[in-house]
């Protein structure tokens, strides 16, 4: 089973987030990045292979650091956190090959993440993790992504992800919308599925793609499929502190 849990938004959330008049009409179609030309600029997104437990999506934000969803670090059946060495980041994976393969040396979930929470909003909050690779990835064609400020309602974002039935190459949805949000969760019109957990959400300005959020879950609002994402601003500093503490404790 791919690590992306499905949930329905509860009345409490929809009461906070104004969805009236939201439209999916302007969303771009999902496009598969099957060639090196298609993937140029996006090879920092990779498949995160979780041993024999499936996969998630991750994104390089430094030569040795990968962002993903916190729930990807846990065995779905037992709830036990995977050992870092069980996880492999396959950067720019497409058509059976990656540009770089790296095992994971350390993995930290956001301290506020609660994997034991029931499916619902409590499980989305702080669903973000930071992985330290065993060796940095230093390739001219594979540059880490910058990060940026949290998007607001009405902003246009993009998502690059792997997923069930499209696991052989990443796909990009170049335009989807931020329907609504609060400081710990965003509702997006972006299309995601099992395996998309941890996928980076980008804002592209002046030709520069910056990661602003991480995909956590898929959901439905009034019969429309949506995705839930965790804002990155603030969370990243907390993750970096947790990773530093992990190094000191090892």
List each language-model region with its residue ranges.
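Catalytic histidine site
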Residues: 41-88
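Short, solvent-exposed secondary-structure boundary/capping segments
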Residues: 118, 185-189
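Protease-domain processing segments flanking chymotrypsin-fold serine proteases, especially trypsin-like
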Residues: 2-4, 10, 20-61, 169-171, ...
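Catalytic nucleophile loop of clan PA
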Residues: 59-60, 191-215
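Extracellular/periplasmic catalytic domains that process cell-envelope and extracellular macromolecules
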Residues: 38-41, 60-61, 81-83, 121-125, ...
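Active-site substrate-binding loop(s) of clan PA
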Residues: 59, 76-78, 110-122, 132-165
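Conserved catalytic-core segment of clan PA serine endopeptidases
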Residues: 26-40, 74, 80-137
